[in-house]
C-alpha cells in the first residue's frame, strides 16, 4: 500500500520532502504552549509515514495531498513557492468573469438593493440569488477543508498561499511558516441590517476554524496582498469590502494556539464566536494568542464572544488617522467573553486607554495587566469600568516576557520566513 501511495504521489507531482525541511514538519506544539496544548495536545501530522509526506507547489497538488475531509491519516505537506488558489484544473488563472453567474450584474445589483428604495430588508430576488451562485462558484476553487492529523508548513522563506481560504472543522492541525495573501471575495453581499448604515460583507477568511479543535497556527503572515480594501470604491456610502477575517474561530472551535504570526494592513483580523445567540460556544473557544504582531489592523485583534482567551506578549502598531487602515480597537469585549491579557504593547499615537478596546453588548469583564500604551502602563479594563474578574487564570503558557521587551522580540521573530 505504501508503494502504491508513493507512486501515486509522484505521478501527481507530489514529491517526498527533503531531510532539512522535514525537521520543521515533524515539530509539535510544546506541552504547555497555550490552549492548543490542552489534554492530547497538538501534534498535527508528525506521525506521518514517509509515503504521506509531500512537497506541493500548486493548487492541484495541495488538494490531492490533503485528500478528502475524512482523510485522517497523518500527513505532512510542505508548500514550496506560491500557490494561487484562483485557478482551474489546468492551473489557468480565474477571475470575476470566470466565476460570475450569467444573470449577475453589479450595476443591476446596486440598483435593486439601493437602501433609498429597498430599505432595510435583507436582499432577496434575482440579483441576490445570482450573486450567491457566483460566490458558490468561487468557493469551490478557493476554500479547502483541512482534515485531521495534518501539518502544513512553508518550505524555506517564501511560501505563500494567495486567494485561498483554509477551513478547519477537524482535530489536530498545524499550520506554520506560510504567508497568506488576499482571500478575495469577488461577490460581496450587501447587508442593510449590519450596523446603522449597513455594510458590505465578504465570505472568505485566510483561515477559518469552524468547530476545529487542537489547532496551532504559528509564524504565519496574513495580509490583503496586491488588492487592499483601501483601494475599493464605496457603494451606498460604505466600503465595497472584498476581504473578511484573517484567522477566525467559531461553532465550538476549541483548544487553539496562535503564536508569532504577523497580521498587517487589514480591517477585521480575528473574531472568536460568530453570534451572541450561539450560547453553545460558552465553555469553548479556548484560545491563546501570544507574540503576534498587528500592524495597521483596524479591529478584532481579537474580538471575543464567550471564550476564555489568553492574550499575552502581543505588539500592536497603527494610527487612528490612517487613510487606509485607521486603528479602531485591539480587543473586542463581546458577550460573556473572558479575555485574560498580560504584558501587551500598543503603539498608536494619541490613543487613550479607554479606546484600546471596544465593549460590545454583553461584555462585562477583562483582566488586563502590564499593558503599555505608547510607553505608559495602562489598565484598559479599569479605563472602561469593566470587572477584572473573568473567572479563570491561565496555566498553559511559557515564560511571559516583560512588557519592555515585547516590541523588539515580536518584531524580530513574528511572521513567515523566520523559522528557517
UniProtKB/Swiss-Prot annotation:
Give the residue range of the signal peptide.
1-21
**Temperature dependence (free text):** Optimum temperature is 42 degrees Celsius.
Family, per entry: Belongs to the polysaccharide lyase 1 family.
Could you tell me what this protein is called? Answer: Pectate lyase
What is annotated about its quaternary structure and interactions? Monomer.
Q: List the active-site residues.
A: 300
Lineage of the organism: Bacteria, Bacillati, Bacillota, Bacilli, Bacillales
According to the record, cofactor stoichiometry and binding are noted as: Binds 1 Ca(2+) ion per subunit.
Task: Report the subcellular localization.
Answer: Secreted
Function per UniProt: Produces unsaturated products from polygalacturonate.
**Catalytic activity, as annotated:** Eliminative cleavage of (1->4)-alpha-D-galacturonan to give oligosaccharides with 4-deoxy-alpha-D-galact-4-enuronosyl groups at their non-reducing ends
Amino acid at each position: 500500500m505504501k508503494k502504491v501511495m508513493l507512486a501515486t504521489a509522484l505521478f501527481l507531482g507530489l514529491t517526498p520532502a527533503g531531510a532539512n525541511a522535514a525537521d520543521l514538519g515533524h515539530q509539535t506544539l510544546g506541552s504547555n504552549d497555550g490552549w492548543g496544548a490542552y489534554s492530547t495536545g497538538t501534534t498535527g501530522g508528525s506521525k506521518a509515514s514517509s509515503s504521506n509526506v509531500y512537497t506541493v507547489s500548486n493548487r492541484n497538488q495541495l488538494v490531492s495531498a490533503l485528500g478528502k475531509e475524512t482523510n485522517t491519516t497523518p500527513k505532512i505537506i510542505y508548500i514550496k513557492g506560491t500557490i494561487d488558489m484562483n485557478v482551474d484544473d489546468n492551473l489557468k488563472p480565474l477571475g470575476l468573469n470566470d466565476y460570475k453567474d450569467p444573470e449577475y450584474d453589479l450595476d443591476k445589483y446596486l440598483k435593486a438593493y439601493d437602501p433609498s428604495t429597498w430599505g432595510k430588508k435583507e436582499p432577496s430576488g434575482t440579483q441576490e440569488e445570482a450573486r450567491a451562485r457566483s460566490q458558490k462558484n468561487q468557493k469551490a476553487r478557493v476554500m479547502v477543508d483541512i482534515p485531521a492529523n495534518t501539518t502544513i508548513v512553508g518550505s524555506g522563506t517564501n511560501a505563500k498561499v494567495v486567494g485561498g481560504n483554509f477551513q478547519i472543522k477537524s482535530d489536530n492541525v498545524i499550520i506554520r511558516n506560510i504567508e497568506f495573501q488576499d482571500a478575495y471575495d469577488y461577490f460581496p453581499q450587501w447587508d442593510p441590517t449590519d450596523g446603522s448604515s449597513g455594510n458590505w460583507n465578504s465570505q472568505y477568511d485566510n483561515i477559518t476554524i469552524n468547530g476545529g479543535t487542537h489547532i496551532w497556527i504559528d509564524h504565519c503572515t496574513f495580509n490583503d496582498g496586491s488588492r487592499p480594501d483601501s483601494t475599493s470604491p464605496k457603494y451606498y456610502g460604505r466600503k465595497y469590502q472584498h476581504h473578511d477575517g484573517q484567522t477566525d474561530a467559531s461553532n465550538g472551535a476549541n483548544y487553539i494556539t496562535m503564536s508569532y504570526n504577523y497580521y498587517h494592513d487589514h480591517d477585521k483580523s480575528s473574531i472568536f464566536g460568530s453570534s451572541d445567540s450561539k450560547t453553545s460556544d460558552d465553555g469553548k473557544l479556548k484560545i491563546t494568542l501570544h507574540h503576534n504582531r498587528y500592524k495597521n489592523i483596524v479591529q478584532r485583534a481579537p474580538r471575543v464572544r464567550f471564550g476564555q482567551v489568553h492574550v499575552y506578549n502581543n505588539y500592536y502598531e497603527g494610527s487612528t488617522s490612517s487613510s487606509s487602515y485607521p486603528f479602531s480597537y485591539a480587543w473586542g469585549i463581546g458577550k460573556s467573553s473572558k479575555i485574560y491579557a498580560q504584558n501587551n504593547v500598543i503603539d498608536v499615537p494619541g490613543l487613550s486607554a479607554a479606546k484600546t478596546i471596544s465593549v460590545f453588548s454583553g461584555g462585562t469583564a477583562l483582566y488586563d495587566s502590564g499593558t503599555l500604551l505608547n510607553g505608559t502602563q495602562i489598565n484598559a479594563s479599569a479605563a472602561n469600568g469593566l470587572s477584572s474578574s473573568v473567572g479563570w487564570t491561565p496555566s498553559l503558557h511559557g515564560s511571559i516576557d516583560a512588557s519592555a521587551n515585547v516590541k523588539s522580540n515580536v518584531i524580530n521573530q513574528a511572521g513567515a520566513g523566520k523559522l528557517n
